[in-house]
Swiss-Prot record:
<keyword id="KW-1003">Cell membrane</keyword>
<keyword id="KW-0493">Microtubule</keyword>
<dbReference type="GO" id="GO:0005874">
    <property type="term" value="C:microtubule"/>
</dbReference>
<comment type="subunit">
    <text>Interacts with RAB4A (membrane-bound form); the interaction involves NDRG1 in vesicular recycling of CDH1. Interacts with APOA1, APOA2, PRA1 and RTN1.</text>
</comment>
<dbReference type="GO" id="GO:0005829">
    <property type="term" value="C:cytosol"/>
</dbReference>
<feature type="region of interest" description="3 X 10 AA tandem repeats of G-[PST]-R-S-R-S-H-T-S-E">
    <location>
        <begin position="339"/>
        <end position="368"/>
    </location>
</feature>
<feature type="modified residue" description="Phosphothreonine">
    <location>
        <position position="366"/>
    </location>
</feature>
<feature type="modified residue" description="N-acetylserine">
    <location>
        <position position="2"/>
    </location>
</feature>
<dbReference type="InterPro" id="IPR004142">
    <property type="entry name" value="NDRG"/>
</dbReference>
<feature type="compositionally biased region" description="Polar residues">
    <location>
        <begin position="374"/>
        <end position="386"/>
    </location>
</feature>
<dbReference type="GO" id="GO:0005886">
    <property type="term" value="C:plasma membrane"/>
</dbReference>
<dbReference type="GO" id="GO:0071456">
    <property type="term" value="P:cellular response to hypoxia"/>
</dbReference>
<keyword id="KW-0007">Acetylation</keyword>
<feature type="compositionally biased region" description="Basic and acidic residues">
    <location>
        <begin position="345"/>
        <end position="371"/>
    </location>
</feature>
<feature type="modified residue" description="Phosphoserine">
    <location>
        <position position="333"/>
    </location>
</feature>
<dbReference type="GO" id="GO:0031267">
    <property type="term" value="F:small GTPase binding"/>
</dbReference>
<keyword id="KW-0963">Cytoplasm</keyword>
């Protein structure tokens, strides 16, 4: 039976960053602890916001290259829609070595940790604060690190929200191009092209300029180069979609994969989705969104995160947010998304493993998803007749 669907235009109430406002100056008032924690592979700058609550997990964030926890996550966690969530969860922000504000340069000859070693440093953070488990939120390089952490320590990770995650090693051509171009002059351009899509660079000039200036003026360039080199030298995560009767390496926890439909990371995220357990994984493609959904559309991402944690059994009485109210008021129906789903992009043959691929992509939205319903089927097993992974667009 056909049903009429309605698109709802959701505009942000106010600009993300007001003119003259620093993107590093948006920290919400919390009980904040900042510490440099010694770990297995060196020191990490960690910021704990709020007080851990009993046996409830803490939200653990990890940022992308060219950013730190403030520039990557403050706009999201300071948004009105995240306030209800942060009342229920403490938040632990991790800065990669040397990426925090005011970080001194590493000494000559310093060996920066590999991506695997950066993941191995995180259990030390949990032990320092007495944390038993976390819900990870990572972007780009941070998403890779948190995925590796969850693969190594499944008992410590209850869920993952992964934005712009790339499960694959850097392609040879991309590695060679980055080496040939040099990094002194091209460093801001390299980072901007990683964070933002081509269309976004030309259409969202003010935000892109703000982040370019942050890279030039606030980041330690030698430290940033070391982090970029570590990310470009990453190994393939070697995850595989589980099949009945086989032993595969995959995430054991629920995962929400998030990507903007104009992001340079679309192909990589879709490939990651194809490698994960469909009964525990949701792919959220955000319409009219570029490379940083937590920056450009924090309200939508906050609601998606709320549904995600509700699916894990937390915040059962959380209030309706404006996205749900808008969609409900439009007359759209609510679907549970059970049963086999069409998964666009995942069966189109080999695709580029680079974040810079800008080939033609299908922009079709799975519009039967009348509401953001991203609760995974917690009782599903590999023996079920069809996959229950979900691809939703908003």
């Amino acid at each position: 039976m056909s049903r009429e669907l309605h698109d709802v235009d959701l505009a942000e109430v106010k600009p993300l960053v007001e003119k003259g406002e620093s993107i590093t100056g948006l920290l919400q008032e919390f009980d904040v602890q900042e510490q440099d924690i010694e770990t297995l592979h060196g020191s990490l700058h960690v910021t704990l916001c709020g007080t851990p609550k009993g046996n409830r997990p803490v939200i653990l964030t990890y940022h992308d290259i060219g950013m730190n926890h403030k520039t990557c996550y403050n706009p999201l966690f300071n948004s009105e829609d995240m306030q209800e969530i942060t009342q229920h969860f403490a938040v632990c922000h991790v800065d990669a070595p040397g990426q925090q504000d005011g970080a001194p340069s590493f000494p000559v000859g310093y060996m920066y940790p590999s991506m695997d070693q950066l993941a191995e440093m995180l259990p030390g953070v949990l032990h320092k604060f007495g944390l038993k488990s976390v819900i990870g939120m990572g972007t780009g390089a941070g998403a890779y690190i948190l995925t590796r952490f969850a693969l190594n320590n499944p008992e410590m990770v209850e869920g993952l929200v992964l934005m712009n995650v790339n499960p694959c090693a850097e392609g040879w051509m991309d590695w060679a191009a980055s080496k040939i171009s040099g990094w002194t002059q091209a460093l801001p351009d390299m980072v901007v092209s990683h964070l933002f899509g081509k269309e976004e660079i030309h259409s969202n000039v003010e935000v892109v300029h703000t982040y370019r200036q942050h890279i030039l003026n606030d980041m330690n360039p030698s430290n940033l180069h070391l982090f970029i080199s570590a990310y470009n030298s990453r190994r393939d995560l070697e995850i595989e979609r589980p099949m009945p009767g086989t032993h595969t390496v995959t995430l054991q926890c629920p995962a929400l994969l998030v990507v903007g439909d104009n992001s340079p990371a679309v192909d990589a995220v879709v490939e990651c989705n194809s490698k994960l357990d469909p009964t525990k994984t949701t792919l959220l493609k955000m319409a009219d969104c570029g490379g940083l959904p937590q920056i450009s559309q924090p309200a939508k991402l906050a609601e998606a995160f709320k549904y995600f944690v509700q699916g894990m059994g937390y915040m059962p009485s959380a209030s309706m947010t404006r996205l749900m109210r808008s969609r409900t008021a439009s007359g759209s129906s609510v679907t549970s998304l059970e049963g086999t789903r069409s998964r666009s992009h995942t069966s189109e043959g080999p695709r580029s493993r680079s974040h810079t691929s800008e080939g033609s992509r299908s922009r079709s939205h799975t519009s039967e998803d009348a509401r953001l319903n991203i609760t995974p089927s917690s009782g599903a097993t590999g023996n079920n007749a069809g996959p229950k992974s979900m691809e939703v667009s908003c």
